[in-house]
């Protein structure tokens, strides 16, 4: 048996003896690493004569290829075995009777919990919950919200569009919950014109939105909540008070300092982004203290064009609106590191971060008590 055959036999035995990924990696480094046994054989080719190189080259390269293939096959086997073992450990016999315990009742997803917390806060301020369709028209998603033609948000790389229907109209998955604001304003304006009921609008809008984005802090489908107030006397001071009260209640702190920075949103004018004071020195963010600032939401006074297109005279009525990502503020409040985990359907994750079914958020009992 030649040296190459002995070396190959030894390496293949080591590969077969590996019982986990670390073992496979150790064999790979020992054989194919910079100073591995096969790598050292390859280095000897440089000192051989052309005739020797012609004979030994194919043999050594063949050894390298066979070792690489064996490593890949063994790694695949170990991964399949690990998955099978995990499935066996976590297997649930669905024919068994349900155990009457807290675990058998499941857990409330953090997104659902935070939506309940937010709506409980705004309901206490006199707001109603409004909802709308996930599939919208270009008009309600963009035009009625003062997005001009050619705006980047209208491009295919930002928005999920459907194929045009028989009328040539192209619908889309809404990129924000703002279309519900327009639907609501149109409804109230029609009620005012037909019935003479000129009622103020105070709504909060939780829902799913869709954009072509995916990383640790973004998801192609995410939850958003917006708020809208329209009245003859709505102003920036009202907006600031509402948002301060919300932040204090949501983060469960007695006081909070807010900082408003000028920004731009097509549907509001002026537009601002709101930062709140916090302490980020520890493993978890602490709100209401410290010297750091963290962006929490965007807001502004409803743009006159939006009011006008929704049936309101901007010379008579004013409004303010705000919006925030539900997943983002859930991560901030409860210390969740990766937004993608919200949608992985991992039972262990939901058991860790989820809430008991009877933990109904109330301002009296404490939102997350």
From Swiss-Prot:
Lineage, top-rank taxon, reads: Bacteria
Paste the cofactor note. Binds 2 magnesium ions per tetramer.
From the Swiss-Prot or TrEMBL record, state where the protein is found: Cytoplasm
Instruction: Kindly report, in one word, the top-level EC class recorded for this enzyme.
Output: ligase
| Quaternary data | Tetramer of two alpha and two beta subunits.
SUPFAM superfamilies in the record, alphabetically?
A: Class II aaRS and biotin synthetases, tRNA-binding arm
Q: Which positions bind Mg(2+)? A: 269
Catalysed reaction(s) here are:
tRNA(Phe) + L-phenylalanine + ATP = L-phenylalanyl-tRNA(Phe) + AMP + diphosphate + H(+)
Any one of the GO CC terms: cytoplasm
HAMAP family reported in the protein's UniProt record: Phe_tRNA_synth_alpha1
Annotated protein name in UniProt: Phenylalanine--tRNA ligase alpha subunit
Q: Which UniProt keywords apply?
A: Aminoacyl-tRNA synthetase, ATP-binding, Cytoplasm, Ligase, Magnesium, Metal-binding, Nucleotide-binding, Protein biosynthesis
Q: Which cofactor does it need?
A: Mg(2+)
Biological process GO annotation list?
A: phenylalanyl-tRNA aminoacylation
Q: What's a Gene Ontology MF term here? A: tRNA binding
